[in-house]
């Protein structure tokens, strides 16, 4: 998603339970809040635009997100030499990289890890990418070891609005319709629906 700020300004936009691939970019004087979302390559053009990331899984270089805040996030940056910009704040975040990603952040609540497999249940190996099949669920051990500022697990399943893959609107997951109706005009239909309560 790209927003260049042109003649209008994106202010106080909220992205909740979203999966955004490629890039989420803000132009000048723009702001966005991302909650329990998976975002690839967030980018703000300068210090007049900012993001707020809460319980997100972020993939790519966060050094291009200026004047932004990160809380309870999991960050995966596959490039060495990247780090969070000094104009940002970060609390209780994990970065999956070998370098000191949080070197510009003064608090000591953030951690750098090198082992993806000890963090995610379904991690397939190699660099973390935004695959549709990836659930970003933490292992049972990681759920108790890596806690956010609110005491819940870091990442998209923690916080006040934990991600739930169950759709809020009913969705048909199975539908079998008989090829023919019976002699009295009845048609056999078998439907299964998945929805939140």
Residue positions per predicted region:
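Generic hydrophobic secondary-structure signal
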Residues: 6, 138, 154, 187-189
């Amino acid at each position: 998603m790209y927003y260049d700020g042109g003649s209008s300004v994106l202010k106080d936009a909220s992205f909740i339970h979203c999966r955004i691939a490629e890039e989420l970019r803000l132009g000048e004087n723009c702001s966005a809040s991302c909650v329990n979302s998976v975002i690839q390559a967030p980018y703000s053009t300068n210090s007049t635009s900012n993001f707020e990331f809460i319980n997100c899984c972020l993939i790519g270089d966060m050094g291009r997100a200026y004047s932004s805040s990160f809380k309870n996030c999991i960050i995966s940056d596959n490039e060495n030499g990247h780090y969070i910009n000094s104009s940002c704040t970060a609390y209780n975040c994990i970065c999956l990289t070998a370098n000191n990603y949080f070197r510009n952040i003064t608090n000591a609540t953030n951690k750098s890890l090198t082992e993806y497999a000890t963090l995610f249940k379904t991690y397939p190996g190699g660099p973390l990418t935004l695959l549709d099949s990836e659930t970003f669920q933490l292992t049972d051990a990681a759920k108790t070891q890596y806690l956010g500022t609110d005491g819940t697990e870091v990442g998209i399943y923690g916080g006040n609005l934990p991600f739930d893959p169950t759709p809020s609107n009913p969705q048909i997951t199975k539908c079998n319709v008989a090829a023919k109706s019976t002699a009295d005009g009845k048609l056999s239909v078998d439907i299964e629906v998945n929805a939140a309560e």
